[in-house]
Amino acid sequence: MSDLHKAFAKSKLAKLPPEAPLLSESSSMNHPAESSHDEDSSSVSSTGTVIPSPSRQLFARASQGSSDSSSLSWSDFFAKELFLTRETDTLRIIHHVYLTPPTDSGPLFVMHHGAGSSGLSFATCAEEIRKILPKAGILSLDARDHGRTSVQRTDGGAAELDLSLETLNQDLVYVARKTQAEMGWEELPDLVLVGHSLGGAVITDVAKKGELGNKVLAYAVLDVVEGSAMDALQSMEKYLSTRPSRFPSLTSGVEWHTRSRTIRNRASARVSVPSLLYKEETPSDPAKPWVWRTNLSATKPFWEDWFIGLSRKFLEARGGKLLLLAGTDRLDKELMIGQMQGKYQLQVLPEAGHFIQEDMPAKTAQILVDFYKRNDRSALVLPPKVADMRASAAMQKGAGAGASFSALHGGSSAGHLHKP
């Protein structure tokens, strides 16, 4: 699993002396006038006329203090949250979704996070997308057994953990269709599927199976490929044993993520990390009552299922394809060949860590918006078909011949027969 493999490497950095400075994108994003880096100027200029939201003021305080790890609210980044109830013969599932609806026929970016994360992993990126493309909508879900999505048996017992790729596929399709019904949309907007790590495997599977029909314009996979993900399975359990299992507070959880360089953008960590933890009612260690919502060790039976065949499906599915990586070393052979054949768009942000959308939200947003625009069918002006051009030319030629014939015969279009 790519995210855990990356995090394992980062866990070694956590043991080093004081942390290096966090990525500067958040400060340049929040204080454009103070930025002197040309590499950020394009994203800053694209948002220069947007009125700052309340979250921008909160970010400003964090930048000035440089160590503020207090939590930020989801409502600073999304318009609403939905709780979508789904019942089967044995289960009652309440899917939790963060949503900002599209306007003026704008696209809907459907985001799926990685294992152990939540829908708020895309919070800062979602806000940046809206700055660049105000008509765009964002739907970012909590996968089952993640965030605030819950699964219970109808008889009140504990539900068996099911994070198979097929189940996650069906969950995403259900959330998209149910959101359409809840919002009263006659049809789904044009969709751009975006998945990080495990989420990349899920959205690729949905695109390959055509579950959402031709509404899927394109799909983007963030920092996961089959080869490196499968290789990382060997070190996954070791990584899980090295990270803290408990925290004294939410603030300390945010601090651990930034100091370990798991998330390199403090502003994003402040909104995403609190959703990863919950406070035990009767903690085994009262000094550290905050624990992980998702037991990643328990997901081991599904690890290989998530990523086997990912590269093939990514290349074969219909729609525009984007692979956004933190390093080209992640490409496997199948994807390298596909890239040389021009089958998909490849973007690399080497300055980011595994959580690209959190580390570099403005740059990730710009890449995603540009990707959408390249695949926007409504913006295409197709040339006329050759057959239509020939038919039009023939009609014009025929009209010209008719006019000449009429002139030669006294202007009478009906014609008259004269006896000799």
Curated annotation (Swiss-Prot):
Please list the residues that make up the active site. Answer: 197, 223, 354
Family of the protein in this entry: Belongs to the AB hydrolase superfamily.
Function (record text): Demethylates proteins that have been reversibly carboxymethylated. Demethylates the phosphatase PP2A catalytic subunit.
> Which is one Pfam family of this protein?
Abhydrolase_6
Task: Report the EC code(s) recorded for this entry.
Answer: 3.1.1.89
Q: What InterPro entries has UniProt attached to this entry?
A: AB_hydrolase_1, AB_hydrolase_fold, PPase_methylesterase_euk
On the tree of life, the source organism's domain of life is Eukaryota
Species per Swiss-Prot/TrEMBL record: Aspergillus fumigatus (strain ATCC MYA-4609 / CBS 101355 / FGSC A1100 / Af293) (Neosartorya fumigata)
Report the SUPFAM superfamilies cross-referenced here.
alpha/beta-Hydrolases (SSF53474)
Where are the residues of the annotated region Disordered? 18-51
Reaction(s) catalysed by this chain, per the record, are:
[phosphatase 2A protein]-C-terminal L-leucine methyl ester + H2O = [phosphatase 2A protein]-C-terminal L-leucine + methanol + H(+)
State the UniProt keywords alphabetically.
Answer: Hydrolase, Serine esterase
Here the segments flagged for biased composition (Low complexity) are 18-28, 42-51
What molecular function does GO assign, one term?
protein C-terminal methylesterase activity
Which top EC class applies here? Answer: hydrolase
Top-down, what is the taxonomic lineage of the species of origin? Answer: Eukaryota, Fungi, Dikarya, Ascomycota, Pezizomycotina
Protein name according to UniProt = Protein phosphatase methylesterase 1
